[in-house]
Amino acid sequence: MDFRIGQGYDVHALVPGRPLIIGGVTIPYERGLLGHSDADVLLHAITDAIFGAAAMGDIGRHFSDTDAKFAGADSRVLLRECFARVKAAGFSIANVDSSVVAQAPKLAPHIEGMRANIAADLGLPVERVNVKAKTNEKLGYLGRGEGIEAQAAVLLIKN
């Protein structure tokens, strides 16, 4: 068997006037993430990890932030399209592990919804998807609440 590990990362600034969407879950908060699409930092990191594991580049190569057709795009749609492309290339996903770093809001109440969305979009049992919520211990721009970061690792299997 051919195993491939991918690592993904994304960060977006928090700004007023936008919804906060993480892992496909809309989270009540006074600010949301700034971006060309819905700026779902977690799904962008996972998408990058999947493309990376398949040696197919990154999210920007497939869904450019300069392309008007992706303006306001639902990142769940992009994740499903990413999965379709790597599946067509002969890969399946073994598991996903991820972390979201946010000083606020508290993400723990939303983790199971995020896991369920990711599992559904990737055709995986929820037991193969993990999402962890972390803070930056009030250090740096994340600790000051200026943005939210996500990191993801994915294991692909070449069929």
From Swiss-Prot:
Homotrimer. 4-CDP-2-C-methyl-D-erythritol 2-phosphate binds at D10, V11, H12, H36, S37, D58, I59, G60, F63, S64, D65, T66, D67, R144. Its cofactor is a divalent metal cation. It comes from the Bacteria. It comes from Paraburkholderia phytofirmans (strain DSM 17436 / LMG 22146 / PsJN) (Burkholderia phytofirmans). This is 2-C-methyl-D-erythritol 2,4-cyclodiphosphate synthase. A divalent metal cation binds at D10, H12, H44. Belongs to the IspF family. The record marks H36, T135 as: Transition state stabilizer. Pfam families: YgbB. The keyword Metal-binding applies. One of its GO terms (molecular function) is 2-C-methyl-D-erythritol 2,4-cyclodiphosphate synthase activity. Pathway: Isoprenoid biosynthesis; isopentenyl diphosphate biosynthesis via DXP pathway; isopentenyl diphosphate from 1-deoxy-D-xylulose 5-phosphate: step 4/6. GO terms for biological process: isopentenyl diphosphate biosynthetic process, methylerythritol 4-phosphate pathway; terpenoid biosynthetic process. HAMAP family: IspF. Binds 1 divalent metal cation per subunit. Gene3D superfamilies: 2-C-methyl-D-erythritol 2,4-cyclodiphosphate synthase. Keywords: Isoprene biosynthesis, Lyase, Metal-binding. The keyword Lyase applies. It catalyses: 4-CDP-2-C-methyl-D-erythritol 2-phosphate = 2-C-methyl-D-erythritol 2,4-cyclic diphosphate + CMP. Its EC number is 4.6.1.12.
